[in-house]
């Protein structure tokens, strides 16, 4: 029974980002999507037109756009896919962090709820996604450094926090 319970929540977490947004009665915020797509497109060609506080996100988004262009994937679908991949990564890392302290019966429903909130908020690779990626990865290395008493992990944590 416990295995079926875990399997149900894991499947639910995996399906939430894959659901089409139109079925949730949300519209796409064209202004933010257009702003971010242009930032990603122009970050390598015209740095004067990019918003410098989002420099790292622009570099990541520009690299992703180049990869999607090579693979002939439409840019918007590619950025939604990148968002889903980052969300899966964040859920996996959160699970790895919390599994030492809590049981699966509490962690998996909380992660599914967090995934629903993330899907309702925005389902496109933007600065919030990049910041969450960097912050949680840094937190993971920091907790590993403190708990396992490995000072080398502090270097990785500080790199992601910067």
Segment roles from a protein language model:
Residues 3-30:
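Transmembrane signal-anchor helices characteristic of membrane glycosylation enzymes that use polyprenol
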Residues 21-39, 46-64, 70:
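Extracytoplasmic catalytic/substrate-binding loops of multi-pass membrane glycan-assembly enzymes
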Residues 70-82, 105-108, 153:
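Membrane-interface starts of transmembrane alpha-helices
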Residues 81-101, 137:
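Transmembrane-helix motifs of polytopic, lipid-linked glycan transferases
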Residues 92-116, 149-152:
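Transmembrane-helix signature of polytopic, membrane-embedded enzymes
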Residues 122-132:
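Short acidic/glycine- and proline-prone juxtamembrane loop motifs at membrane-interface regions
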Residues 130-148, 161:
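Specific aromatic-rich, kink-prone transmembrane helix
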Residues 152-162:
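Membrane-interface alpha helices of multi-pass inner-membrane proteins
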């Amino acid at each position: 029974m416990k295995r079926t319970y875990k399997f149900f929540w894991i499947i639910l977490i995996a399906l939430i980002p894959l659901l089409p947004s139109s079925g949730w009665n949300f519209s796409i915020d064209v202004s933010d999507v257009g702003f971010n797509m242009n930032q990603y497109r122009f970050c390598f060609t015209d740095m004067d037109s990019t918003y410098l506080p989002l420099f790292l996100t622009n570099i990541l988004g520009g690299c992703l756009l180049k990869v999607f262009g090579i693979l002939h994937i439409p840019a918007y679908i590619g950025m939604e896919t990148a968002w889903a991949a980052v969300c899966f990564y964040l859920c996996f890392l959160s699970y790895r962090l919390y599994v030492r302290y809590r049981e699966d019966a509490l962690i998996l429903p909380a992660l599914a709820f967090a995934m629903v909130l993330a899907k309702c908020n925005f389902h496109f690779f933007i600065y919030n996604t990049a910041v969450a990626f960097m912050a949680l990865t840094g937190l993971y290395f920091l907790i590993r450094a403190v708990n396992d008493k490995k000072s080398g992990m502090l270097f990785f944590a500080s790199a992601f926090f910067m």
